[in-house]
Amino acid sequence: MFQGMIDQVAGEIEHGDGHWRDAVSSMAHSAHDVLRRHPWVPPIWNDHFPGPNRFGHLEWILRTFSDGGFPDELVYHAYHAVEFHIMGFAIQEQQYAQSGMGDDMSEAEIYEMLGKTLPEAEYPHLWTHVRQHMDGDERDEFAFVLDLLLDGLENLRDAG
């Protein structure tokens, strides 16, 4: 039953066309949005044999990198890098939401809770990081890392 449900969710991922980088970026953002709508999927994505939608998704990614001029060995690594970014980010978002520091806590409550175990004088860099989380947009973080990944893959491809 889960296999079919996961495959149905995989079918919601939109696969763009055009230049490889734009297409992969568009697909990754679509997949991220889909997984946010179905937070139960990322932890069990690989627990079940893929169905036709997941196989189609895999084929699309491999073909897009291949058509983008990537050699087979780099296609292999590019696929895993992008998929791990999408899934890893989705799982981390889900776990953060379940940590007790979700949207239902005020910023003051989060600072108070952290202040009890993490004195700012001892952990100044961690506190800077926490404030960036509080003020930032997680969607921007997903895009930032995805762009780094795609830049690196493109550089590897071009270096031959």
Regions found by a protein language model. Name each.
Residues 60-104, 109-112:
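A contiguous pocket-lining binding segment that forms or flanks enzyme active sites
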Residues 9, 13, 39, 90-97, ...:
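Short amphipathic alpha-helical interaction/hinge segments
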Residues 11-56, 72-75, 79:
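Hydrophobic alpha-helical connector segments
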Residues 95-160:
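C-terminal peripheral helix-coil segments that are non-catalytic and often amphipathic
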Residues 34-38, 63, 67-71, 155:
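Secondary-structure boundary elements
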Residues 3, 33, 80-87, 128, ...:
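Generic alpha-helical structural context detector
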Residues 26, 56, 60, 77-84, ...:
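Amphipathic alpha-helical interaction segments
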Residues 2-10:
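Short, basic, alpha-helical segments at the C-terminal edge of helix-turn-helix-like DNA-binding modules
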